[in-house]
Amino acid sequence: MTRKERYTFILDYFGKKMPVVTTELNFGNAFQLLVATMLSAQCTDARVNMVTPALFARYPNAAEMAKAEVEEVLEYVKSVSYPNAKAKHLVEMAQMLTDAYGGEMPDSMDELTKLPGVGRKTANVMLAVWFEKPAMAVDTHVFRVSHRLGLVSDSDNTPQKVETTLMKNIPPSLASRAHHWLLLHGRYVCKSQKPKCDECEIKAVCKHPNPKS
């Protein structure tokens, strides 16, 4: 099977399996999506969704959070991973978003990554989910599944290299959905530890069947 055939097979499978797919994070506007995505770094979406209702009720937009003290925001996010750093970044992000962008979410990689606490992966989530632009956010699940399914080479050993290879081979119209397909497959089937290979419907093309990790 050529790489092109591999991509076609896998994308066709997911397109039929999950024709409609999006993030599992809960949000009501662009600011809230950015906050939830920042909180989700090295933390489960389920945990983030437990803390954001109260957080968003108190700080529904950037202008409100920009006025907050870090300690105040920390009280709402203390159950997520790295709460101190994340609370600090959230307040600083809200302040910059308010002061430099008038509360409007920037829609480019360069501008998004100027915001405190916003890296390439988070920016790609915003571009794909909120702005519906062709973008590929590579988290630990996407990275792992891409390698196991042979979508990328062993030399693609960084998230950005994986992103580049995926974007070269996935049609722009499918890029944002493909991110969610790979992520959800990694989250629920192709897990890091004890992957559910017996439940995997595309194991025939897996390059690492029954991996130990």
Regions flagged by a language model, labelled:
Residues 2-213:
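Catalytic cores of DNA base-excision repair glycosylases
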